[in-house]
């Protein structure tokens, strides 16, 4: 404002100009300055001047990201690429709880429980069992605790209404998530944009009108050829074909966000004042990481950042970033634990012994508690993509000279890499090939926090030791336990084998 000759205060209108280079003034604000109060009527009292800036797309020289960006796009907005079909066609051929995306594009997935459709037909063996007993779940249950009788969610008295993101660990990795009503309950479609594609994980859920989650799926974006399997021979001379990386694996990466600044000049009459709006530079670095899983559950939990005992940055459905650990879920044993884990894929239950009931959650016909090489019958709770399943409890025994736990590196069939923080295990007695198992640590069921990142590796098998404990591979730089036993409440990594 100004005072006139009579001493009265008069409002003076003001406008703003911008100089992104600091010297050249213009009336047009920078494109990244998405909102700004650029003018006002003036007056005796201060007025708010608001500014918002557009989110940056970080700069990365990551080879995996570059390969994904260069890949030929799949599908279109009107005809998304069907992830349950080998060529993206309309027919539902093979389903899973995890779908792998390796290129930008538009995608869809059918509303089917896990692997309940195989080779274009109902796969009832994925949700029923041929064995009986108090520790056998039969049939498998859905979010309501009801036995599943049909592969399609809509065929079990459920009415899908909307789809939404639960979380993702790369910004704008999966967008435009939609529920599309159609036959067999419809499908979910989504977009993976070329500008933001990179290695990452997302969980997408289908909900009913009351906002209850009916089921959810893991979308893993990677350029890794997961079908380039590595054959290993265990101590019992049984062969397994392992995926070359962990489920949901993301390699270490550094993303740089450059500083942005702009001078703003406020002009009122013949006077002016200048300010500088500045968005500071930032660097986000991660080490090798992969999601954690509680035994018997289908949904991934947030990875660590791969560099310490800290959760990797993840984004909620509003795009808000966080490094918070999973929220705690306190459930009863048995079916209550299972159905509540389906309803709450973002929660980590704090029961040290998990459901504390069933032997067959990851192998439908299993009733055995001793370590073995029995065939694993993949279930609708198996987290693996099409063509893969969790390994039997003896799968890792070839990694030591005895087939059992050893506490000396001289008894390990492999070499420890201190730079990569993991074991290169020999895949056979000739030692002509190796397979890498990184020390990705674990997530605690009591604190919900990641631990032992870079020093310990933990990988679930499909088989239980008892109703609350399970076999897993445990590694450190000096010891390896191929059939170690632990409470099923822990969050561990997964190394799938070929189905």
Cite the ranges covered by each PLM segment.
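Extracellular/luminal low-complexity segments enriched in Ser/Thr/Pro
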Residues: 183-199
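A short beta-strand micro-motif common to beta-rich folds, especially ectodomain repeats
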Residues: 198-209
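Short beta-strand edge segments in extracellular beta-sheet folds
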Residues: 218-227
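Extracellular and select intracellular beta-sandwich modules with Ser/Thr-enriched
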Residues: 212-217
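Short, ordered beta-strand-loop transition motifs
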Residues: 178-186, 233-237, 417-419, 429-430, ...
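C-terminal, surface-exposed recognition/capping segments
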Residues: 333, 339-499
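Solvent-exposed, low-complexity, repeat-rich "mucin-like" stalks and linkers
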Residues: 1-176, 230-270
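Conserved, compact domain cores that house catalytic/ligand-binding motifs in diverse enzymes
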Residues: 232-358
């Amino acid at each position: 404002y100004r005072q006139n000759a009579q001493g009265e205060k008069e409002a003076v209108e003001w406008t703003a100009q911008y100089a992104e280079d600091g010297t050249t003034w213009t009336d047009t604000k920078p494109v990244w300055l998405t909102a700004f109060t650029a003018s006002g009527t003036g007056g005796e009292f201060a007025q708010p001047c608001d500014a918002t800036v557009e989110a940056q797309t970080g700069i990365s020289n990551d080879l995996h990201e570059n390969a994904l960006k260069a890949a030929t796009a799949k599908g279109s907005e009107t005809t998304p690429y069907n992830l349950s079909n080998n060529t993206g066609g309309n027919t539902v051929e093979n389903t899973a709880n995890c779908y792998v995306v390796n290129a930008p594009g538009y995608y869809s997935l059918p509303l089917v429980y896990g692997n309940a459709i195989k080779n274009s037909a109902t796969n009832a063996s994925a949700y029923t069992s041929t064995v009986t007993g108090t520790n056998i779940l039969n049939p498998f249950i859905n979010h309501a605790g009801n036995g599943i009788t049909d592969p399609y969610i809509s065929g079990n008295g459920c009415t899908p209404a909307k789809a939404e993101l639960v979380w993702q660990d790369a910004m704008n990795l999966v967008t435009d998530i939609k529920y599309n009503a159609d036959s067999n309950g419809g499908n979910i479609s989504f977009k993976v944009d070329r500008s933001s594609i990179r290695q990452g994980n997302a969980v997408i859920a289908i909900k009913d009108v009351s906002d209850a989650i009916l089921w959810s799926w893991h979308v893993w974006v990677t350029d890794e050829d997961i079908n380039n399997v590595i054959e290993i021979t265990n101590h019992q001379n049984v062969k397994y074909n392992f995926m070359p990386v962990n489920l949901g694996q993301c390699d270490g990466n550094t993303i740089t966000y450059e500083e942005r600044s702009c001078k703003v000049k406020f002009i009122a009459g013949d006077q002016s004042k200048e300010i500088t709006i500045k968005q500071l530079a930032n660097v986000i670095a991660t080490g090798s990481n992969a999601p954690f899983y509680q035994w018997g559950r289908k949904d991934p939990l947030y990875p660590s950042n791969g560099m310490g005992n800290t959760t990797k940055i993840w984004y909620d459905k509003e795009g808000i970033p966080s490094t918070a650990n999973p929220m705690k879920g306190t459930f009863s044993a048995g079916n209550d634990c299972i159905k509540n884990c389906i309803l709450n894929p973002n929660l980590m239950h704090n029961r040290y012994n998990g459901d504390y009931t069933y032997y067959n959650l990851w192998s439908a016909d299993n009733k055995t508690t001793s370590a073995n090489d029995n065939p694993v019958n993949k279930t609708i709770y198996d987290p693996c993509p099409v063509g893969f399943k969790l390994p039997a409890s003896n799968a890792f025994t070839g990694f030591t000279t005895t087939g059992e736990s050893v506490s000396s590196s001289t008894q390990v069939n492999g070499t420890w890499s201190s730079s990569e923080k993991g074991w290169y295990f020999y895949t056979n007695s000739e030692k002509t090939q190796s397979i890498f198992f990184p020390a990705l640590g674990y997530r605690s069921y009591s604190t919900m926090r990641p631990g032992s990142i870079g020093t310990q590796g933990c990988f679930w098998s499909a088989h239980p030791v008892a109703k609350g404990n399970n076999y897993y591979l445990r590694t450190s730089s000096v010891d390896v336990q191929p059939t170690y036993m632990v409470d099923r409440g822990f969050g561990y990594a997964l190394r799938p084998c070929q189905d």
